[in-house]
Amino acid sequence: MSEQTQQQNSEEAVENVEAVETVETVGNADGVQEQAAAEPAYEDLQARIAELEAQLKDEQLRALANEQNLRRRHQQEIADTHKFAGQKFAVEMLPVKDYLEMALLDQSGNFDALKMGVQMTLNELQKAFDATQIKEINPKAGDKLDPNIHQAMQAVASEQEPNTVVGVMKKGYTLSDRVLRPAMVTVAQKEA
């Protein structure tokens, strides 16, 4: 390479170094400005994060308190339901009690009047049962024994098919499909 070319290359190299130094200086100046600008944005973000965290914590506490209130209210409703479960039936039974008390107060000795009073009482009791969905289990002779609703009290020799109802000793009752008392029945067994 010639001296002139070397000198030209040296001058270009010096110019490039100066240009790089200028860019770095400008870059550093911009970086300082960017860093200075970034710090307020960072602080704003930190403040916003703290604000959102506080808001979230407040919402969590409110949700927890609401859940506890709902649980307490639900438990109170269950307790009230148990406490007053028989209220409807009790109200329905009041006229029955009234009729029985009137029958005891009757001093006439009239058997027909007493019988009529008992019939009225039975009618009121049946109304109370209907209103509270208490149904009779009253199987007929020949019905198949159902252990879910019948209780075999005795077995008797009969011409009927075995394990069928021969007679009813006491009626059974259900409350909304739940057996309160099974019907107490006599069932047929094979003749010996």
From Swiss-Prot:
Parts of the chain that traverse the membrane: none
A Pfam family reported for this protein in Swiss-Prot or TrEMBL: GrpE
Disulfide pattern: none
GO biological process: protein folding
Predominant cellular place of this UniProt entry's protein: cytoplasm
Protein origin, superkingdom: Bacteria
Keyword terms of this UniProt record: Chaperone, Cytoplasm, Stress response
One GO term describing the cellular component: cytosol
PROSITE patterns membership: GRPE (PS01071)
Compartmental location: Cytoplasm
The protein's assembly and partners: Homodimer.
Function summary: Participates actively in the response to hyperosmotic and heat shock by preventing the aggregation of stress-denatured proteins, in association with DnaK and GrpE. It is the nucleotide exchange factor for DnaK and may function as a thermosensor. Unfolded proteins bind initially to DnaJ; upon interaction with the DnaJ-bound protein, DnaK hydrolyzes its bound ATP, resulting in the formation of a stable complex. GrpE releases ADP from DnaK; ATP binding to DnaK triggers the release of the substrate protein, thus completing the reaction cycle.
UniProt family annotation: Belongs to the GrpE family.
Protein name, entry field: Protein GrpE
UniProt organism field: Neisseria meningitidis serogroup B (strain ATCC BAA-335 / MC58)
Gene: grpE
